[in-house]
């Protein structure tokens, strides 16, 4: 398994890797493609989840709403 420094990972990717999940596995659990998960993690697109997908995301990542990052990808330049 490729090793990443914590600072190299987006918040969503950190959570996914912590659960030993691939982008494909997370995408399948949420009913989206692997490319969609990749785009979320890289900050190329913003997740638009249905309530069912949102609940599933929390469940598969084993996190609470409070633990979910406000932004899944990398912070924008405006955020510092």
Question: Where do the PLM segments sit?
Answer:
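Short, basic-rich loop-to-helix N-cap that marks the start of a DNA-contacting helix
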Residues: 44-58
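A short, Lys/Arg-rich alpha-helix, primarily the initiator
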Residues: 1-18
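Short, charged recognition helix plus adjacent turn
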Residues: 2, 59, 66-80
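The alpha-helix within a helix-turn-helix
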Residues: 16, 27, 58
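Short coil turns linking two alpha-helices in DNA-binding domains
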Residues: 22, 33-36, 64
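Conserved hydrophobic/aromatic packing and binding residues within compact polymer-binding modules
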Residues: 12, 26-27, 37-40
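Residues within the helices of the helix-turn-helix
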Residues: 13, 24, 55
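Recognition helix of helix-turn-helix/homeodomain-like DNA-binding domains
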Residues: 32-47
